[in-house]
């Protein structure tokens, strides 16, 4: 085996609340724990919030998701440190740019061996996604997929050569095969039949269909209780607050199932998670998207020896084959109820399914997965040492979504200096705001466009105050009598004698149009459309 002096993982990382963050953290620790490893194992973490996260010392470099320059710096960091191999965690929504294309700029600049783990593989990608994937396959020395379905799609849809592909399953904790009753008293549910779904909450999870199935389940099994474990996904919470969870809670009350559905709205650590999984009699993944090539929650549940009821998304079809679980059609509450009732009523069959699932997943425990990755890294390093990636090779993989120009990070300090609680001042003396010139409607409309675009790129909540200020100015600028926007306001907040004109009016409408498209909150959009 070729010795690897350092291994770098690129992706999001714990304590960020995301399935891939958990995966990246787990694979780093699993590899570092292998007895033959004396390598320097570290991570390059991707941040989706401006202030980042309180990472462990394992994280040596941070990339701001929307800042292209950070990707170039990350490549330089990896090159300068002469890492033995880079393992990239890829999902389209993880990186900035069109369909996550910012990561390509880093990879084209990278001069180290690259293994890419694909957490999403689409059979019908958009044009942008297809372009990103094709460049990713060229720039990577090997591609890892977490299921046979992913390998088949890469071969058939993207034309990737078989020898470039490796299947390494999603890692899982190595847990004992235990009776669910062992953990139930800890959660106050002893003597009950426990159904469980865990993971970060979002509308694609399909949990509403299990809730709709609960009355039928309870009619046959009055002691059944359904636990929904997990906080709302941070991105969902930023964009729509707790709308999905609140809708689920309303459905529970409308069905009178308050005594049979428990919400645990929190992100639990691994030890507590495994105790929750341990107490489940039936684990349910009612996901709505068929094109899901991997599910970490499904792997965890099966690896703990759970009887699973799932919708037939790709990973579930593969994992639950050979009677290792039960499938129910998408969006079908009656079918879910039938499958759950069957398992709860047939203890012998339920335990047989549990055992088949548990035995099948022994190859997926983290120590084994870590060994699989180390063997792959060794093979890649050995092959790469004879033909290292040149700068020209990286440039040859360039496509239409990114170019090689490094743009500076957008700096809003001067815009903020020119903005007071009324709006954006028209002019300045050198860099100092000139109050004698007052405020212009057209300028505030343009500022609304800039701040809206900046928020979309960075999700920096500090920009929201600017958006509110410019939107408020435009609302005040509208003259109902003429049906036009007034063009100028003096510094004393009185409108100038200049009559409304069509130029200011058209630019204001342009700004409000962008406001409707880019404003993050419904209240802002509602005001912009008035």
Set out the residue ranges of the language-model regions:
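Carbohydrate-associated surface elements
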Residues: 149, 171, 232
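Low-complexity, Ser/Thr/Pro/Gly-enriched N-terminal "stalk/linker" regions
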Residues: 390-443, 457-489
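Conserved acidic donor-binding segment of nucleotide-sugar-dependent glycosyltransferases
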Residues: 322, 326-333, 342-347
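A short helix/loop element that forms part of the nucleotide-sugar donor recognition site in Leloir-type
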Residues: 177-189, 194
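Nucleotide-activated donor-binding/catalytic signature segment of Leloir-type glycosyltransferases, i.e.
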Residues: 239-267, 271, 422
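Conserved donor-binding/catalytic core segment of Leloir-type glycosyltransferases
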Residues: 9, 189-205, 211-214, 227
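A short, well-ordered alpha-helix in the C-terminal region of glycosyltransferases
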Residues: 342, 349-363
